[in-house]
Amino acid sequence: MYQNSLIDFNPYNSLSAVEVGKHLYWKIGSLQLHGQVFIVSWLVIATLLTLSFLGTRNLQRIPEKFQNFMEFILEFLQDIAKNQIGEHEYRPWVPYIATLFLFILGCNWAGALIPWKLIHLPEGELAAPTNDINTTVALSLLTSLAYFYAGLSKKGLGYFARYIQPTPVLLPINILEDFTKPLSLSFRLFGNVLADELVVSVFTLLIPILIPLPVMILGLFASSIQALIFSTLSAAYIGEAMEGHGEE
């Protein structure tokens, strides 16, 4: 009763309420999927595909306006891959690194900009997909598969010789490193996105409208940095797996 009266007194409280650990479950056989994560992820993917189509449907030799912006984004993402993977090996990995960056950025910004709490769900609430640990772990495991594939495609079975370099004594540590990389990637992204949403929610609860705006702007900046860090580290891990096999 007290909680309902508080929400009636201050309607912003309903927007600032945070539901942690509650999910809208979709059941497919014996599997339980987090429905709200898929809904927002599909919206982000649809938005990215739409922007890509609009930016490439009428390409001009001399780019103007939106095409110029899209080419700037592409060059920025190419530079990330080139700097981390190497000038001779980076091109095949640009689509993967670019997809990682744009998807994470879109998910983070979707959580920071769109008032999802206005959309009522039977259970849980819509939010940034990256504030769900399952999403960040899945992205991290994709990066793990990517750098294993990169190493094996360049070195063959000789890739596994890295585990006993520079000395076989380091074998356990080198194996452990392959587990810590995806763990650090996933928990860093998950923790920062969740913390940002919690901070904005708390400030909105305490002082509505005015004070949360600078915090939201800071959250957008932090969300962009997290997307950059994740994609840069992913490219660095791929480059490390292929190290020593570029052309001189």
Curated annotation (Swiss-Prot):
It comes from the Eukaryota. GO terms for cellular component: chloroplast thylakoid membrane; plasma membrane; proton-transporting ATP synthase complex. It holds the Pfam family ATP-synt_A. The chain crosses the membrane at residues 35-55, 94-114, 133-153, 202-222, 224-244. It is found in: Plastid, Chloroplast thylakoid membrane. Keywords: ATP synthesis, CF(0), Chloroplast, Hydrogen ion transport, Ion transport, Membrane, Plastid, Thylakoid, Transmembrane, Transmembrane helix, Transport. GO terms for molecular function: proton-transporting ATP synthase activity, rotational mechanism. SUPFAM superfamilies: F1F0 ATP synthase subunit A. Gene3D superfamilies: ATP synthase, F0 complex, subunit A. It is a multi-pass membrane protein. Belongs to the ATPase A chain family. F-type ATPases have 2 components, CF(1) - the catalytic core - and CF(0) - the membrane proton channel. CF(1) has five subunits: alpha(3), beta(3), gamma(1), delta(1), epsilon(1). CF(0) has four main subunits: a, b, b' and c. Key component of the proton channel; it plays a direct role in the translocation of protons across the membrane. This is ATP synthase subunit a, chloroplastic.
